[in-house]
Amino acid sequence: MADIKTGIFAKNVQKRLNRAQEKVLQKLGKADETKDEQFEEYVQNFKRQEAEGTRLQRELRGYLAAIKGMQEASMKLTESLHEVYEPDWYGREDVKMVGEKCDVLWEDFHQKLVDGSLLTLDTYLGQFPDIKNRIAKRSRKLVDYDSARHHLEALQSSKRKDESRISKAEEEFQKAQKVFEEFNVDLQEELPSLWSSRVGFYVNTFKNVSSLEAKFHKEIAVLCHKLYEVMTKLGDQHADKAFSIQGAPSDSGPLRIAKTPSPPEEPSPLPSPTASPNHTLAPASPAPVRPRSPSQTRKGPPVPPLPKVTPTKELKQENIINFFEDNFVPEINVTTPSQNEVLEVKKEETLLDLDFDPFKPDVAPAGSAAATHSPMSQTLPWDLWTTSTDLVQPASGGSFNDFTQAQDTSLFTMQTDQNMAETEQALPTEPQAEEPPATAAAPTAGLDLGLEMEEPKEEAVIPPATDTGETVETAVPTEGAPVEEAEAEKAALPAGEGGSPEGAKIDGESTELAISESPQPVEPEAGAPQVIPSVVIEPASNHEGEGEHQETATGTEPREAAEDVAAQGSAGEKQEVATEPTPLDSQATLPASAGAVDASLSAGDATQELPPGFLYKVETLHDFEAANSDELNLQRGDVVLVVPSDSEADQDAGWLVGVKESDWLQYRDLATYKGLFPENFTRRLE
């Protein structure tokens, strides 16, 4: 008996040695290896199928454990409700019955899932271990087959052939081949069939789970509705004991998670003692309040850092009242709310820069809608003045169609023949070289002397385009007729150069002043006299950057003519005289006028290059990093062109829609490069 066991053990050891030797030779490349690529693919699919089935079994067991936990939790909940239920309350027995039936439903649902799905899954996975063992055994038989084949080939190729050994090797080879074929054929049939059967198994399993769950929820919904009706009737029975949650949010809803980083806090620099004469710091205002975000859409923009502490030297100069004017009156400005959003730091002035000329008009800065009074009207009591609060639209056509400017309101009156005669006598035959031509407009010639001028009802407003500035006024002196808009540009030519036939010759002067441009000539109505403005020449002022306007002129007059006009205005006739400082060199007038035309044309082209629906420009004060694809990435100092927002909710939350000016000038694509950005990160530009 011991000999038999020893023989079997020795035989198994010999097989293991032969297999190990064969594998080593195959790894070293000294012996060929039989391979079946199709069978190897079947083995890979089998391993994948086994892993998927094992995971499904694990998750189903977890699902059943959760059902068991829900059963216990539901039972404890209904028991606690039954314990707190008072005997005199409505539906005490119904509550107990609902709890018991719910427990039965949970138990039935759990048991059916175990019987219909879990046991089936266990049976499905039970066939994998046997097939796995057969695959491993086939691999061993394949090594034995290769070893017997190599041994037979070695004996047949040797020089000294031993027929007995060769015949014995052939028998061993045929035996190994037969055993390998048995395992190989069976697995070649079973593995593809098992791989295909997984689809039907998954279908049956999840159909069973879904049908059982649907039936369970349908039955338990009836019990839940029953419990709801009991609670409703109990509430009606005790209506005077209603319960309300105090302090509960009314608009609590899911918000869009948009984590937008706030800009980094910038440390406020300590002001030096020499920065301000009184060493007083301006109080730091708190950060702007984060706007309310629209519900269920987008949170408001991030909060910018606190403003830097600045010395009191940066006080606005417009708050200082000038008491040194001859006609001191408070200035009345009518501005729109949008203009108050951006504070402009005005240029500081000294007493040496003040102009004490009573004929100098108070002119509002370019771009504002302020309505000021002419100097001639300042002789009246200040409480009798009128202020125009209407915003004047820009005149269309010509080189001025892209600018808007507030026009001085003035009253025109007719001049008598005597005034005309005095004005013509005061005209010099030759302009003085040291007195540069200054332009002014006043309706003096070509008017019917029997009619009085009415107050203009409409005014065409044009801002200055260059340093010298140009202002074109139009007024129709007809009775009750609307004022037609007229625009003209001044071109002052030196003596000896030709002019257009539209210029008026004065007392045999050889110099003619031509009107270079007239985009919209005056179209007077029937019976209305034609207005030909005269010219008043004033000495040039050295005040640079005061923002005064020049009016269109067709001739030149000395300063004495302006004084005569002022004397007539004080006698009861109202007239507007506007002066503008000009360079001392009269030869520079023509290049300045040409530059004004070029500047206005370029400004018109710039307006046409703005995106559709353009509202205004803003400058970024802080860096902003976009948290979503529909937001802009902004750096400090970027200029953004604001366009109307598609969503009122985003606008109410403090977001604006716009496109970076650099992207717009480069790509001209508003739909691709526009995006949202926080309004409180920017400041508005005029």
Curated annotation (Swiss-Prot):
According to the UniProt entry, which residues carry Phosphothreonine? T260, T280
The membrane-topology field of this record reads:
Peripheral membrane protein
Pfam entry (one): BAR
Compositionally biased intervals (Low complexity): 424-441
BAR domain: which residues?
24-240
Q: Name one GO biological process term.
A: synaptic vesicle endocytosis
Q: Give the span(s) annotated as Disordered.
A: 244-314, 421-441, 483-597
Q: Which SMART domains match?
A: BAR (SM00721), SH3 (SM00326)
Q: Which UniProt keywords apply?
A: Coiled coil, Cytoplasm, Cytoplasmic vesicle, Cytoskeleton, Membrane, Phosphoprotein, SH3 domain, Synapse
The UniProt entry's coiled-coil ranges are 10-83, 144-191
Q: Name one GO cellular component term.
A: synaptic vesicle
| PROSITE patterns the record matches | BAR, SH3
Provide ranges: composition bias, Pro residues.
Answer: 261-274
Transmembrane annotation, as ranges: none
What is its subcellular localisation? Answer: Cytoplasmic vesicle, Secretory vesicle, Synaptic vesicle membrane; Cytoplasm, Cytoskeleton
Boundaries of every SH3 domain copy: 613-686
SUPFAM superfamilies the record matches: BAR/IMD domain-like, SH3-domain
> Where does the record place Basic and acidic residues bias?
541-562
Xref: PANTHER family: AMPHIPHYSIN
Tell me the protein's name: Amphiphysin
Instruction: Kindly list the organism's lineage.
Output: Eukaryota, Metazoa, Chordata, Craniata, Vertebrata
Q: Which gene encodes it?
A: Amph
